[in-house]
Design a protein with these regions (language model features):
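N-terminal single-pass transmembrane signal-anchor helix
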Residues: 1-18
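Flexible, low-complexity segments enriched in proline/glycine/serine and punctuated by aromatic residues
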Residues: 2, 23-148
Length: 148
């Protein structure tokens, strides 16, 4: 009888470890997807910045800016004026089988800030957030790059 009890506890332990492994794998997938999405946005900005003059560079970087206000995954402000950036940001919220979107991500959980001041060195910061139904607070991925 005790042997059966010990066996059952062992089986339940193995099932619990399997569930934990699946959860960790899902978390890793979302972190990887978030890193890839922020990298895609940074690459787009690097490739499409107009570097012909300093004024043109500043203007194009400013056009990439998206919801520069707010903090902690509750962003606000004007949307980006660049259609390519908006298309990439839309991929973040497009969730479904075979789609790269992040669960719980909305338009208000994405931000691109640009600092074109002399002290900012054309710093671009891209933040995207997502939240699983089991998460108490949103998770985020932030990538910082400089455009010269």
């Amino acid at each position: 009888m005790i042997a059966i009890l010990i066996f059952c506890l062992g089986v339940l332990g193995v099932i619990g470890m399997g569930a934990t492994a699946v959860g960790a794998q899902s978390d890793a997938r979302y972190r990887t997807d978030a890193a890839n999405l922020t990298n895609d946005i940074a690459s787009y900005i690097q490739l499409n910045a107009d570097r012909s003059t300093l004024t043109n560079l500043k203007n194009t970087l400013d056009s990439f800016q998206h919801q520069p206000g707010g903090a902690n995954c509750a962003f606000g402000g004007a949307a980006s004026a660049d259609a390519g950036v908006l298309g990439l940001l839309n991929k973040v919220v497009t969730v479904g089988p075979g789609l790269p979107g992040l669960p719980g991500s909305t338009a208000a959980t994405q931000q691109i800030t640009v600092d074109t001041t002399a002290a900012g060195f054309n710093r671009v910061q891209i933040t995207i957030c997502w939240q699983l139904p089991t998460d108490a607070a949103p998770r985020n991925q932030t990538l910082v790059t400089y455009v010269h």
